[in-house]
Amino acid sequence: MEESWGEPGETVEEPTSIEVQDIKLFGKWPLEGLNISDISLTDYIAVKDNHAVYLPHTAARYAVKRFRKAQCPIVERLTNSLMMHGRNNGKKLMAVRIVRHSFEIMHLLTGENPLQLVCEAISNSGPREDSTRIGRAGTVRRQAVDVAPLRRVNQAIWLLCTGAREASFRNIKSIAECLADELINAARGSSNSYAIKKKDELERVAKSNR
């Protein structure tokens, strides 16, 4: 026996409004209201709504085309940079776990959104000026040059992860704790941060080679 699905002339009303759920990183940290202090880096620190993810593991092919990695969510770039040195290659889940634990520690210590601290740390850690080698074989000199915004973001992420990795080596503190300390110190502009010290050193060398 066939079931009747209403009268022939009857129309079914569709729901007019659909609630859009906010996407929060790890189900906790929202991307709304994040402020990037350095206006030149706003296009290269991917924290806008179209870059919102639940986990920093999009598995997209950002290396296929030049400059496409600027579209990668900034927390995923931080996670990928933790997978350095051969023994850590490919251990993405371990890196995601480290970032999640460090975000929890940062929130406990500061009471702020960890994503805002990451944005501030990257803005403060990217060197604005660097020096490059100019000249042919025999006569080589160093010349100060301005650093592109994407290069600043790349270098800041690398310095932050390197500082956390070196601080945790032969240390009772876990790498999640060291990463949280490094990000907080860099966001505050403290000289206790490895990334801030290296950035100041690079800018000092560039200034002497102007």
Curated annotation (Swiss-Prot):
Q: Tell me one GO molecular function of this protein.
A: RNA binding
**What is the name attached to this protein's record?**
Small ribosomal subunit protein uS7
Q: Does the keyword field hold Ubl conjugation?
A: no
The superkingdom of the source organism is Eukaryota
Gene3D superfamilies listed in its UniProt record = Ribosomal protein S7 domain
Which residues span the membrane?
none
One biological process term in Gene Ontology: translation
Give the InterPro entries listed for this entry: Ribosomal_uS7, Ribosomal_uS7_CS, Ribosomal_uS7_dom, Ribosomal_uS7_dom_sf, Ribosomal_uS7_euk/arc
Q: Per the similarity annotation, which family is this?
A: Belongs to the universal ribosomal protein uS7 family.
Q: Which UniProt keywords apply?
A: Ribonucleoprotein, Ribosomal protein
For this record, the Gene Ontology CC terms, alphabetical, are: small ribosomal subunit
Q: By its UniProt entry, which NCBIfam families does this protein fall under?
A: PRK04027.1, uS7_euk_arch
